[in-house]
Amino acid sequence: MLFHRTGVFEKVKLLPPFIHRIAAGLALLLLPVCASAQELTPGAYWPLPGGINILTFVDSFNWGDIAFEPSVPVDDAHATINTTAAAFTRTLSIAGRSANVGFQLPVVVGHLEGLYVGVHTELDRFGLGDPRLSIGVNLYGAPAMAPKAFASYRMHTLVGASLTVAPPLGQYDNTKVINLGTNRWSVKPELGLTHASGRWVVELMAGVWLFTDNTDFAGGRTREQAPIGSTQAHLTYRFAPRIWLAGDANFYTGGQTTVAGVKHLDLQRNSRIGSTFSWALDNHHSFRASISRGAYTTIGADFTSVAVGYNYAWTR
């Protein structure tokens, strides 16, 4: 049910065509993968010694406005979305290079509201989003190292690559136009360049999200989405070996959707800016906090986001 508190839309089969434009637009918001192109991830390719296990807990709170394509009769739309995720990462060696593999599982709570043809309407969701599997390897500048060798390592110029896969395992119900799972596969290859000089670190990343079709969208329709290209830039200052602060920015474009053969005017050209702070207490415990906001938004979520995370690391 969509906007269930007013009963405006009770069954997917009865929805007029433009409602599916609303559904396609909202589908960009609640899903954890939808926010993936918006990510700001400083330090993603910084090397670690092999044989380290890292357990991570992250809570992010997002709130703001929603921009729809002009033909959608929704005004004053805004949302609050809270995502709590648990993740596990293992560092290792691949062909003599430092690398890592990871798994992440998100739980999402979302509330959306706005004016549909002048009537105040609301929607709530709670459940599991699509998980993510990832693998990353430093192709240049960071060979695989044991902890003793890593203690004397100094980062200079790195080139890394990663692959993230989100299988369609999140909560999904084809009788609802808005779901937490995507009912499709999402894959993101990415390249990253890191250069460190003294206390400063500059990072540039470029990737693209690729999507399979959702063949059971909103009552059995097929929803296609074009790739979303994303770039990130980060400038980090290291106050001490375990404490750093980064300025973050990104830009992402693409993602136009087609539902039942009808193209929507929802091409995204959006960007975000923010800042990230990281503090490691010792070799086992570290904390990270970040804040970001939309700098330019055409279609989708113009959100402010605040996140806090905790990492626990151990060997073998």
Language-model regions: role of each:
Residues 53-55, 99-103, 133, 157-163, ...:
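Transmembrane beta-strands of outer-membrane beta-barrel proteins
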Residues 59-65, 105-111, 139, 165-171, ...:
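Transmembrane beta-strands of outer-membrane beta-barrel pores
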Residues 109-224, 266:
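Outer-membrane pore/translocation modules
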Residues 218-316:
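Outer membrane beta-barrel transmembrane domains
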